[in-house]
């Protein structure tokens, strides 16, 4: 059993509520939409990267005006450049963190991430110090009960699917990252229209459990990292968070 299956099934509603209430998430999606639209056509039908970002923005309840503004900006003559980055580090008691960024100022972002680690009980590590303990996977979550039927649908569509789990009325599909879009198309072809999560995730090979002061310190560290405007994603190996 994938150790993250229970995690996705349990936190998806909480995640959606949190994202929907957080205007910072909107701004971060605005940047991501702009970058995707700028790198290709500003039309999701001819730009799969943009289509994927817009699908995720919908799940996070990003307002239409935020999306339209980002796409309009990409259509203009602006030459603002954003660079993807990844930082890795450690929290208390065996906890590991990966931070993905999208920034127009790499030096600023690197300094901010290092400060967030240092001031909140963590340590930033070298590139590769943590990521080898995580696997990149496609993750899809939607309402449903019959994991076996979904698994069969995906196999018939020649999707490289790793696992399908059903729990608490939700189905979680894990795919190889290159097959995430293929899996989505197969599910849509079989009548599945609404998705709670469609993400490329870094999934820990093992999880740790934190308690008491360690857990509070770790939560503060994650909050500090996620509060940075340039931080797009934070992955970690702490259970039940």
UniProtKB/Swiss-Prot annotation:
Annotated GO molecular function terms are:
DNA binding
Record flagged with keyword Manganese: no
User: Sorted alphabetically, which InterPro entries does this protein's record hold?
Assistant: Integrase-like_N, TACO1_YebC-like_2nd/3rd_dom, TACO1_YebC_N, Transcrip_reg_TACO1-like, Transcrip_reg_TACO1-like_dom3, Transcrip_reg_TACO1_YeeN, YebC-like
Name its cellular compartments: Cytoplasm
Q: Which GO terms describe its cellular component?
A: cytosol
Q: Alphabetically list the UniProt keywords.
A: Cytoplasm, DNA-binding, Transcription, Transcription regulation
> Family, per the entry?
Belongs to the TACO1 family. YeeN subfamily.
Stated name of the protein: Probable transcriptional regulatory protein str0195
- Originating species: Streptococcus thermophilus (strain CNRZ 1066)
């Amino acid at each position: 059993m994938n150790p993250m299956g229970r995690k996705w099934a349990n936190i998806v509603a909480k995640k959606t509520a949190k994202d929907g209430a957080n205007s910072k998430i909107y701004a971060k999606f605005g940047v991501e939409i702009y970058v995707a639209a700028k790198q290709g056509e500003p039309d999701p039908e001819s730009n799969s990267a943009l289509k994927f970002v817009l699908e995720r923005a919908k799940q996070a309840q990003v307002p239409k005006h935020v999306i339209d503004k980002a796409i309009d900006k990409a259509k203009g003559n602006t030459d603002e450049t954003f660079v993807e980055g990844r930082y890795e580090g450690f929290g208390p008691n065996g906890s590991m963190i990966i931070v993905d960024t999208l920034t127009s100022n790499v030096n600023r972002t690197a300094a901010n991430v290092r400060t967030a680690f240092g001031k909140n009980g963590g340590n930033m590590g070298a590139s590769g110090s943590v990521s080898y303990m995580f696997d990149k996977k496609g993750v899809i979550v939607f309402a449903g009960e019959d994991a076996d039927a979904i698994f069969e649908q995906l196999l018939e569509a020649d999707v490289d699917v790793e696992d399908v789990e059903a729990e608490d009325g939700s189905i979680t599909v894990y795919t190889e990252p290159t097959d995430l879009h293929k899996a989505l198309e197969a599910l849509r072809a079989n009548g599945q229209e609404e998705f709670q999560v469609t993400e490329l995730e870094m999934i820990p090979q093992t999880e740790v459990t934190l308690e008491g002061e360690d857990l509070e310190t770790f939560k503060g560290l994650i909050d500090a990292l996620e509060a940075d405007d340039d931080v797009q994603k934070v992955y970690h190996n702490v259970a039940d968070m």
